[in-house]
């Protein structure tokens, strides 16, 4: 398995990022994606829900069908999809000009990670963005 950036680099990318597209965000508060997206908002990130099945706002934000539909630049693409469904997300992230492809804990796709890296994205795989932010940056 490819190596993630070291913890210092992960901390730095979290500190310099302000926008996160949350791919696979659910409108159900009981879902992990919902809880983590809410935490990202509390940390000060502007989130963009990306889920073509959503019909209304989630956590106060209008959903988008794809990353490319988001009208402002996205720093991090945080992925809550099954590992086998990540390649189209990586392609969308590259096409949208995102900087980081972040695959949540349990999400591993070496092919998608290699594709994203070949196109200049930093890739973090099989890690929780909420835990890493709280641990590496801290919560005030």
Region spans (language model):
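Conserved beta-strand elements of the Class I
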Residues: 20-23
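A short helix->loop->beta-strand "cap" motif at the edges of active sites that frequently abuts
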Residues: 43-45, 96-100, 119-121
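Short N-terminal or domain-adjacent regulatory/targeting segments
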Residues: 1-16
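Mid-chain, well-packed structural core segment of small domains
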Residues: 67-107
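NAD(P)-binding Rossmann-fold cofactor-contacting core
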Residues: 26-31, 38-58
